[in-house]
């Protein structure tokens, strides 16, 4: 037996010694589509003179060539070659590679007869399997800024490059995903210039989060690259706060006695320091971001030159830890959280900053050994490469590094200790010899002396030593730079007598073999590598040789230091680095080749509000993308040659050996051990939150601790929490927080003693951003400039005073892509002013304009400040009176002006500050001035039919609403059209700039409302496509339609759930009805939006799960109470819902086109059949209401149900039809076809307006029309239904609400397509009306195919009768819109719904130096704020800062910020059935804005009170899921930004969204005895404001003596009155912003329009409440003036008392008897007799 084993060993040795000829095949292990593949072929051990010819190619493993063949020729003297093999898309597609279902692999094949004939192989091929990737080239995406507000426009660029980083022109696919990961936009484009630019708008309802823009080559699915940006609500800050710790870490070792120190810095965005006070608080933060307040560490400090320093001693910190039972050893892995709020003293604005990266560590350094090889070569040197960094991430230079190396040889070991310091970039490279017998190396590495960082690493020797090893040692272990020559030494190890003659090597970078070479073997063989840009940012050096027939290999990963681009791009601002706003700036762009340079400038304030987390494109990101093509894994080396090749990213075959087939592009992740955390930490950190383990329970607890902006007991709040599991922690934590508030004492002494005992409640709840206001651009210079070496760009800077960061990216055909280092430009004025205006204000309200002057000069500045005169504003001295102000050096000062607006318009308000030598500044902003009262709208529709003798002429009476504001802008807008389809579907209707959404005059907050952006536009596009009428509209209309559809699609995706369903709100459960609605619309929009069919298939699958056994569908969370629409509660609701889902599923069948979806499609079809059976049974019963009957008939007809079912449904529907003349409609039926709510009206006269039906009737009739069109086509019944619907449209083309509008436009579109004709018909309309200047006449000549002049919009006096004459052979429509402001809302429809708004709170304007802020620290009055004596409690600071959008701090010689509390109460009549959603629209008092934090509490907490809120200018919209039958109130705070006096009442409206006619409108006023009702103006400003006010004259005053005929001149010459009465005042009544004096006529002197005036009749006289005029009851007055435009509720004229009115108090008989007054009385009596009998004689 021993002999046999010996012979076997000798035989194997001899066999291995024979060096047989081989063909070696090398390639990257990944093939990229369209990118040439580098292939290395080598001939090994061939006899001299032998020549080998062959070719290489790619093929599908199943067969079929995937590339052209590439020939090669090798010989013993020329034994290797590097080939480039093309991988064309066409060949890959034709070979069937895309059809492979699993990870696609492709074979690299070398084919040569030599392999069969000489190498003794069975075939003439030799190959290796490669992983195929569709990734190719490089794509970079750039946005114009890192963070956006919802509703903002995002501009982006896509740079497309090939594998060599050169411009590529190709097809790209671009997608946008929202913060939920849902795709909201997809585009297929072709880049002709390699730079593609586009933009899209973020929906205004988007939730905060991170969005993503991705781009890929259309044929390369894996070439996807993306960039991220943040979406959240913010406004640019005026200044930025930074927290800088002295050390980026906190040592947690017991012996460390260092203080915790940090610096606070606050600077304006334009670079100047902020004066003010900093309030800082601290907490412990765990890995999940949960914070626990550290009591007793709160600090407040004065800023000096914008800076302050905070120091916490070890004892202070330890005391804070003791209070929460935390030891120092428990801190590892945690962070110390610091938050600072800075309040600046001049303007009182507050900004915040957080520090979240301050870690507790056991060492000051981090130690990284990832660059050290995991394989050692016994007998050679081992290279340990370590990177030492400070905890901040910066390189740690000159840090001692100690290495303890344990060399293990069997059971023996020896320890080697080495010490070396890091170089300038924190690197250390230590080389030490490894004895040949070593099998394992254990490394213990420490960095630093005191408290070192420690790392451990175990390195194994290869298991087999028979073939020896190859050692690769760099001559210089440091990383090379581009341009360096990198030298590596090669040496065989463990081979006593090497027989090979050459080393072979390869250089691999960017996923390709960049070079192959060989070097003759020497004792030490050196290889030189020239490092160029093509090798950056890293490359593998792989060397190998064959020994005894076995490959021996090693590799090394070399990182390149230089991160510069191949070309050159520099941005330089010529001249000064500091500019003034609106200056001209010269930007010099320098390149080293001809290139396109893409520019962009970003306001650096964006980084202060959260944009730092999304850094702009830079070269590090570029190299990261380039390096992603590196298919190698690890630092190099391996147990054997195959692993060396494989880990370097190579595939290899020598005929006998083969590397493993790669299965994935990514590398296997190294397993890391994780230190176990203290399980008891959370309980110790939070005494209350620690009681709950689940995240949901913790959130409920947090919600319970949050204080609401209105009073509710904890029990009341908990009752509103729907989930039982949430209710208990919510109630417990709510009571816990209430106890804290109840125990609070506001005394200063108590606070000083016990402040450390208060719980910082804010750390239990997420932080809110505090928003500030701005009106300046956030980015600009978004342009692409062609540059040839150099270009000087001249641009004008925006008006912002800030620091701009200018970015540049160049793209060159010769040098590729280069990202410039950003350059910054500071825009600043050393003297400037800041101006803030109210959102809006009403006429004759008074407000205080307070511009703040900033002086950063070294000297005091004396300036003159004035407001430029403008019509419509009353200003001091008419605007020419200036205030002389001295602003001390380095400080700020406010200046006050009182302003009274007198005109309802948008007025430019300009403030100018000017000093000597042209020193000064000017700011102009638009002041929005509104009319008094509330807006009222009234619409009328008339049918024009010249073929009807009775309808050829008609009289339209004027409006006589007694509540009209007397001197408003009264008019009636008249619109006439002869082409209803083009008006409704064209650029004035569904395709108007905002779509139908802008025409509805309703909000678009919830998911269903969002669909109004999409559905009507799709309908209109379909109509115009089918009738080929796009050419009749403007050329850009089609593009606008596509844009509207894209926006609607993007918006609705914000409501999608992960399972494909949709809910009315993001926080609300999914709705069957709404999900079906979305499925139907998005199925129709597939082509326009490029939606993924799989997503809609998920939606359809969710709907199928909602079907019950009887075929009906149920809705777990209804959006609308459909019982309202069917009649019978429950039964009809289910029928209508089922029919609705059937319609949606039928339209959704188009998304099941692929084979994978065939099974789901069959399920959908079966579901429709089952549902149709249910609908047929209900229709046969004959008990359906009109709406349920109509939608059922349409669903059965649409899905082609059995004829019997369709007939039953049709007959049931037609039995409920109401026919009036040429109109057919369906009203609301309660439960059977003979029980109608509203009996059909008798045929009306053509001269009467068309009655406007409720939304439900319109929707029902629309479904009936759709059914009739499918059943009978365009017949007589369809004509009548379409005619009725046509005349139900509003003035702007929409209907009542969303559903009736969507369905009706769908129905009318289908009808108009069926009835479309090219026949031209004409309509001539003449309109005439009497005006002040006589008869006004308009003649219109229209036809049914007009585009330009399609419709005319005319304006007539509101009270005038309009006469209409109609001629021609075409029918038409005349619509009238009356819009005016009303005095009060006493006669509104507040019978069904009720709303009440109350405003409470102290509103003070007194300049008080001892202001008390319960939400902040008290500050003494001084020019420079000092540290306050009395601190705020943690709970107060938390609640105070969460209740504001922006805080006005205590100001020097400035008013306290005014706050009020709004309480909104709603309820309804118990008999009223509502659709389920109501909206309260509250117009805020002038000068106020709602506190967003308060509104968010109403919507975001577990005890949700409001479903959603929106703010739009002065409006706050609150969405309620339902209106209770009992009074329910919500509250929120409002803050006054601008001081306003004589504040007028504002309006509030509560209405049913789906039936807006159900509404309640009320006025509410400011708090009584409030300073809001005080007069702010004085002197000439008040005189100007009262210039339009009437003046009361007294007959017995000498100046009124009529010796010179003063009264007669006033009456007959100027202004020449139109009426004259003597009246006795009966009473005075307040009407919004007016006072009404009801008076009885005692004598008629003169009249023009008031022909019915007689003694004893009453007339109303109105005066503005802002005027000082008072007419006393029971006194008699002479009043003469101009006729009014309005009437009272009896139809009698009412008169406005203004500056053109004569008002004289009549003397009593007793006074006229006195001798002193007798003459004056006679003169008055003579005037009355003469004027009444003779009038004016001119």
Curated annotation (Swiss-Prot):
Further remark: C4 is a major histocompatibility complex class-III protein.
Posttranslational modification: Prior to secretion, the single-chain precursor is enzymatically cleaved by plasminogen (PLG) to yield non-identical chains alpha, beta and gamma. During activation of the complement systems, the alpha chain is cleaved into C4a and C4b by different proteases depending on the complement pathway: C4b stays linked to the beta and gamma chains, while C4a is released in the plasma. The alpha chain is cleaved by C1S to generate C4a and C4b following activation by the classical complement system.
SUPFAM superfamilies: Alpha-macroglobulin receptor domain, Anaphylotoxins (complement system), Terpenoid cyclases/Protein prenyltransferases, TIMP-like
Site (Cleavage): 753-754
Annotated ranges, domain Anaphylatoxin-like: 700-734
Cross-link (Isoglutamyl cysteine thioester (Cys-Gln)): 1006-1009
Official protein name in the record: Complement C4-B
Domain NTR: 1589-1736
Cellular component terms per the entry's GO annotation: axon; dendrite; extracellular space; synapse
Presence of the UniProt keyword Glycoprotein in the record: yes
Organism: Mus musculus (Mouse)
Single GO biological process annotation from the record: complement activation, classical pathway
Record localization: Secreted
Propiece span(s): 674-677, 1444-1447
